[in-house]
Amino acid sequence: MIKTESYVQEAAGGMVYRLIPVTEEIIRCVIGKEEIREPESLIIEKKDYPEVAFEAEEKEGRLNVRTKKVLVSLNLSEGCVEWKHADGSKWCTQNKADLTKIDVVRYTTGGEKPIINRVKTVDGERNFIQNLKTEKVREGYRARVFFDWNEEEEIHGLGQAEEGIYNYRGHNQYLYQHNMRIPMPFFVSTEGYGILFDCCSLMTFNDEGRESYLFLDTVEQIDYYFMGGGSMDGIIRDYRYLTGKAQMLPKWAYGYIQSKEQYYTAKELEEIVRHYRELNVPLDCVVQDWNTWDPGNWGEKILDQSRYGDNKECMNRIHEMHAHTMVSVWPNMNAGGKNHQEFFDAGYLLYDYATYDAFNEKAREMYWKQAKEGLFDQGFDSWWCDSTEPFSGPDWGGAVKREPWERFLMVGGEHKKYLDPAVANVFALEHAKGIYENQRKDREDMRVLNLTRSGYASGQKYAAMLWSGDTCADWENLKIQIVEGLNMGLSGYPYWTLDIGAFFTVADKWQNRGCGCNTDPEPKWFWQGKYNEGVKDKGYCELYTRWLQMGTFLPMFRSHGTDTPREIWNFGEKGTMFYDAIEKFIKLRYHLMPYIYSLAGAVHFEDYTIMRSLLFDFPEDREARKVENEFMFGPSLLVCAVTEPMYYGPESTPVDREKTWKCYLPAGTGWYDYWTNEKYKGGQYVTVEAPIDRIPVFVKAGAVIPVADGLVYAQQEPKKPIQLMVYPGADGEFVLYEDEGNNYNFENGAYAITKLVWDESAGRLNIGEREGSFPGMREAVYQTVIVK
């Protein structure tokens, strides 16, 4: 046994094991074939960890390492690792691990001129190099790590996939980057622990057969962190401790964001904002999708002057209306453009000769320089880093969806052609790093916001908001989206959203397709909406409305898609059912803004999670474990999404059914119907009214919810005092967070918190002294409303 102040190392089962206590509840386990290395990590933050008191002893063929909260016991003959509570009760067992030596190769043309097949896909224009050859660069390993889980134990997390699997027990999952897949090398257990693999290669999770294991495609060694945080919040706190705190997003990012594929001029963006202001419907951002470049210059970060020559003036007028903009940027560029040529001349392109090398710091700086000069300096406020899994093109076509294993090999293999296989899953992470770090160098007065389709562990510290990709408009997909959002939160990632209404709406009427594809009659496996006529179909209007109602309670509230427009006036006019329902929920989002922005503060300062699986707050409720279409929005609001039609099917076909919805109310607390204030006991199913203008929302007894009236943009100063809505029935508390909203002064203490404590026995709300201050701080005036 080798023991130092920071780790213990020993040979076991033909391997070398190093156990490194990081905190009292986090222990790192590194397994090497012959030696242990300390390579630089792309996902674990560099920091000086405090010394952790631990004991280590070898006894009866086992190496036992104990901190105050965790006991890890290594079987020296077999190499099995038992993870236990400090009192000896077991969490789980890592049964064994194996490392198989492989040749790590890269693909090059070997000095030949590349033979480039440029293909126009639904997901953009792509280069496919026809004469690539493999070249060995080093030796590495493929690894498997086997686990033994309790029969009733559930495994959640692993990022976002597309199948809607909530509990991964009994399932196989492929972890690779794809248009609708965002892998995370992290899972949590209902037994109260989590495991994070420091692995950036392709991975799989397998619990289908007799053995349960994770497969790591290309590594130097096995390297994982065991987190015994106990509660889900505790585990996520441990995860963020390792991977970095989530950055504060600008306050306006929590307002309503209007997007579609696509707007065509700067003036059109301005008119969208103006129309919302004229309707008095709240709005904070309008989004410019792809195709801002000159014709043929795909991915160029230079505006087409014939359509965006007045961009800066239009952006200024948008800012005068207290709104913001977001612009789409791509990592790949066509040859012939100025941006592409600059990367080519510097040698900063990957071997598809189109995509910049985001792993190169100088290349990231060049990308930022181009984006800043061509877009940021022209008035755009934030980034939409689209297609950040730039090598999934081979799967993004054809009429038949391939088998899961085939897609994994195809798309993963394409990433390994152009990236080192050890980092095949983290292009998007490095891309986000470049945007965040370089914008911060230039503009400390503007918070970074990067909406991106792919990501990885630690991306939260780069202000990267992930979204679920190009989904299809049908009710089943809406259900799946909720599950995937819950698993993303259980993966430690707090910033996730979706395309409200789904991206693709058209079924088989290809003439109505967007994305410039209305002349392509070939079926696409992913273009499988149910509504050929889009907003002209009442069935789609109902689906969109229900999607938006659920989306009101996500970290980002954003409408987007192709095939059909998404602005509110396309769903009718004021006084009609869909328009009024959409308006009601957009205004509800702003009514809740003090509550929502306080949750945003908690995400940064307290490592909180906004969209919360019921596992976070009701871990002992066995029935709550089964619920996949409900979630907590912060500590107080239970959101029950409506995921079935009640009024219309496709082609405006009337549906005859009750306008009610069955909801589960978790045990251990009382609940209020948000709309009627009717009280319910927890631990039961209830059926409540769910007409088109509302979905069931319940408030937890003891909740204190700060709200504001009359806002049309997030940073607007309320004309009336903030109301503190109290729902009696239990003691409760909430922390109101405030700051300037769009700079980084909060990092130096420029923010304020107010503790709100409801004393049930006294029937009194105690409003604490405001702690802290910041420039422009509003007067601390409140109106307390006790709900009866």
What name fits each language-model region?
Residues 699-788:
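Accessory, solvent-exposed terminal regions and/or long lumenal/extracellular loops of proteins
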Residues 89-106, 118-687, 691-693:
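Catalytic-domain carbohydrate-binding cleft regions of carbohydrate-active enzymes
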Residues 1-2, 19-20, 51-58, 63-64, ...:
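Short, exposed beta-strand/loop patches in secreted or surface proteins that constitute
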Residues 17, 64, 70-73, 90-91, ...:
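Short, isolated positions in well-ordered beta-strands
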Residues 2-5, 18-63, 101-103:
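A low-complexity, Ser/Thr/Gly/Pro-enriched, surface-exposed linker/loop concept
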Residues 20-24, 38-48, 73-87, 96, ...:
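Extended Gly/Ser/Thr-rich low-complexity repeat segments
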Residues 63-64, 79-85, 671-673:
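Short polybasic amphipathic segments
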Residues 19, 29, 65-69, 638-641, ...:
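Short, well-ordered beta-strand segments enriched in hydrophobic/aromatic residues
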